[in-house]
Design a protein with these regions (language model features):
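Conserved beta-alpha junction segments in alpha/beta enzyme cores
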Residues: 1-262
């Protein structure tokens, strides 16, 4: 597995299925960009190269290395062996084609799905403070920072969530991406189940809620949602039973209170 640099951490089953989720933002007859959020520890150069090769076979030069971005949610409970650098595949005892192939397949399929569902719409952005969802994993080390530096911040961790909301002109909201800094380590180093960890679970809860809400007004919609932990730092998930519910409720609040359109 990929996550704790532990050769003894060998997958024995699946906690829940991993997903690749994509949005394409395009101008009519103009520029476009693809953003893929992958339920994996990280993306890899060799994965992107292979994905671009497949997209070029299907779409020509429409999608290239310049307008396709692939990002991982940083789960520490995902499959290993799909990166091209030795240091990252030592604990999986080398390159694992099974991991690599299924990741490439999933990314390719989600981009094709997004391409085939391009529709006119708008993008909104919002920010808010989410409390009690994570803690500093080394508060004592944080205190070694100069006092003047620490006084600039209210907390010893970043508690700001940024959320992009995608709205179809006809259907209304169809999905979101968000950035919130917490580490994907709720599943410990003794875990042997493939999992999207806290960000993957939060995304699935969000999708279930979104699909149930959306089914009231449409028969068939593809929803793409995901928590995107790019500001990871030293923040670890806070351990309490209602943390996922807290995060989901906060997402709902953000989705309902957009004030800025881009």
């Amino acid at each position: 597995m990929m996550g704790y640099a532990n050769t003894g951490q060998i997958a024995s089953g699946i906690h829940f299925r991993l997903r690749a989720r994509a949005f394409i933002v395009a101008e009519p007859k103009g520029n476009r960009v693809v953003f893929v959020n992958l339920d994996a520890c990280m993306a890899s150069q060799i994965v992107k190269i292979k994905v671009i090769e497949r997209l070029k076979e299907r779409y020509g030069d429409l999608y290239t290395e310049k307008n396709v971005a692939i990002s991982g949610i940083h789960t520490h409970a995902g499959p290993g062996g799909y990166l091209q650098y030795v240091v990252y595949i030592v604990t999986s005892f080398g390159f694992v084609h099974q991991s690599f192939d299924v990741i490439v397949d999933g990314i390719e399929k989600c981009i094709i799905q997004a391409h085939e569902n391009l529709r006119p719409g708008s993008i909104f952005v919002n920010k808010g403070e989410l409390l009690d969802a994570g803690v500093n994993r080394s508060p004592s080390a944080y205190l070694n920072n100069p006092a003047a530096e620490r006084r600039k911040y209210r907390y010893n961790v970043d508690k700001e969530m940024t959320l992009l909301k995608f709205v179809d002109d006809d259907w209304g909201p169809v999905g979101s991406f968000n950035w919130f800094p917490t580490h994907g380590t709720s599943m410990s180093r003794t875990n042997s189940l493939i999992s999207g960890d806290n960000k993957g679970a939060a995304a699935r809860f969000m999708e279930d809620w979104f699909e149930q809400k959306g089914s009231e007004r449409m028969d068939s919609v593809v929803f793409e949602d995901e928590g995107l932990p790019r500001r990871i730092s030293n923040i670890i998930p806070r351990r309490h039973d209602k943390r996922m519910l807290l995060m989901l409720c906060f997402w709902m609040k953000l989705l309902a209170s957009f004030s800025t359109q881009i």
